[in-house]
């Protein structure tokens, strides 16, 4: 007697994307409390100009860097953050930002919301 196929659906396990966070760019404005403060772990380039051999080169690992800041956007393969801002007088908003960083999203290992 032939085996019957099970009618159970196989559910695909969703893998949580660790490289991006959902962000509503239109609602951010200049209210600092609306910007998520994040820690981003990302892979950097490693180089050495000295003499070596291929075995040593094959053992090298990429350094993992950590950047923390206010997440501005993640679009077109680029993640943008800033760490400093100038407060607006008498309001919880900001006029200008400083210490900006842009990171290729493809090198991000993880991004975590800190607050």
Q: Where are the language model's segments positioned?
A:
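Conserved RNA-binding domains used in RNP assembly and mRNA/RNA metabolism
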Residues: 2-115
């Amino acid at each position: 007697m032939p085996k019957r196929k099970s009618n159970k659906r196989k559910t695909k396990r969703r893998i949580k994307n660790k490289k991006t966070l959902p962000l509503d760019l239109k609602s951010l404005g200049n209210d600092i409390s609306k910007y998520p403060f994040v820690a981003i772990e990302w892979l950097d380039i490693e180089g050495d100009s000295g003499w070596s051999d291929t075995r040593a080169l094959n053992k090298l690992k990429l350094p993992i860097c950590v950047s923390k800041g206010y997440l501005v956007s993640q679009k077109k393969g680029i993640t943008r953050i800033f760490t400093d801002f100038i407060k607006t007088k008498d309001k919880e908003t900001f006029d200008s930002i400083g210490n900006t960083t842009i990171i290729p999203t493809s090198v991000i290992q993880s991004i975590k919301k800190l607050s």
